[in-house]
């Protein structure tokens, strides 16, 4: 094993021969990892004997940053968790604060949230499944979903002006109602997306090469998945029908009719198929929410979290006070302790919040599903080949930004 000394620190190279086994690095900047994390693999030819994972390459101190910010300035931090479906992260945080302050959210705002969150789920699943296709050599299947994802990003822009890290919505609802352009784009999407999605699905679902590559790759049983605290599509692919939207409904999800798809073997193919069906179910939810969108306000009556109109600021002392407190980050919330979770794009995303009555959280912890999945990764790829390790990581949808908070 080669050794490098730099500033009295000793580094041992991982590219070495240990008896009959070779030890190699998979990451931290390997293109197949789709993120910044490292796996040190001990291999016998192509077969993986053991794996040791490393997190922290993209540490950004999410939690401590949030504990030093006003409540309404924490939303942009949540964008950087699973950035493939950031609106879900944003709204999960908003609902956590609303639970603490016991705010009553108008029905229209709840339905608007459902529409945006399900669009985000579709975008997340399209990215994940198209990357699985790329890792099996099906490059064309990568381009089809991205053209549809672009339409979702355009709808984000109409709501908040951003595309990837959205900072969408506010504590209490939205900053503005859906625009006429958004309505037109959503109607067009609901009309054209199903056909485009089935074209993408037909490229992979019954493709013999794709099936041979993904079936049996990176399996995990329902028992082991539960022991690791798996959630989301990875747990459902193992056969457990747990979904936060059904088990602990929020934002009026109990109003909508949809099914929870589950797999059998918990392998890469099942994870792919579960996400494919979840895209169809998300489309059903969006159609129901949009067709039954209630009248009313798009925001709750909590002026301490909403900038008042300029006319009121200039002519009303109370509005001026609210404006000042919001801009200066002086809005306080009651003393309390809450936990709230939402069904994120890759599983249950939870926020544990402790407030001491100040302008910032006393303690805020994120429950990040990717951190949990990554603990099981070495077990799932042991005995597999290197190519199976790549597919397993893609199908688990491990986002590096969530690993170290």
Specify the residue positions occupied by each region the protein language model found.
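Metal/cofactor-centered catalytic core regions of large enzymes
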Residues: 1-405
